Amino acid sequence: MGRDGKGDAWKYRQWRPHGLSGIPRNYTERKLKVEPQFPFKKVYITPYRLQRHYADDGTVSYSELKRNLEPTGIKIFDDFLQYLTAGNSDLQVFADRYGLKLTDIDSMIFVLTGMRGIDFRKKYQVWMAGQLLRWSDMSIAEVAKRSGLGSPNNLYLTFKREYNLAPGYYRKAIRKPGDVGKYKL
């Protein structure tokens, strides 16, 4: 029993700043003792399907973009990557599809990438949102939905946290002439 007679659970019920409510104060980050088998950039699947090309006479055409939809060869992980690429974000729904627990999915992602499942998902969503902002003329709301972040507010908060920029300013900073329309969904 703890000093208040309630056991040790009282430690985890203390007030915490917003965003840390599910992480105990004594949480220690897990780390792989070896290099992850699959670095993030090797497993990311772009949402774009077509790439723009210019002919010698100046006409524009689009061809199928070569995308590796199974970058790891591990079926369940490749399915998970495709699930995220489709703009889905609920890890529990994905776990239920396979009859697994959320901790099973989290452990799989950790073993393969060295990242916690929720951190991997967030990085995937931010990376996809960045690509959508750069290469498309989608509205902020469409980018938020397509990337799996859900709402424009979530997109804004995530980009402020990651880049210290609002999504619209990020788009202006990253985009170069000719970027819009280079790829199509």
Residue ranges of model-derived segments:
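Pre-recognition alpha-helix immediately N-terminal to the DNA-recognition helix
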Residues: 72-79, 121-131
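Residues in the recognition helix of alpha-helical DNA-binding motifs
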Residues: 108, 112, 120, 157-162, ...
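Short, intrinsically disordered/low-complexity patches at protein termini
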Residues: 128-130, 158, 175-181
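Short amphipathic alpha-helical surface patches that serve as generic macromolecular interface elements
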Residues: 123-126, 140, 156
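Short hydrophobic/aromatic patches on the structural cores and recognition surfaces of FHA
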Residues: 105, 129, 155
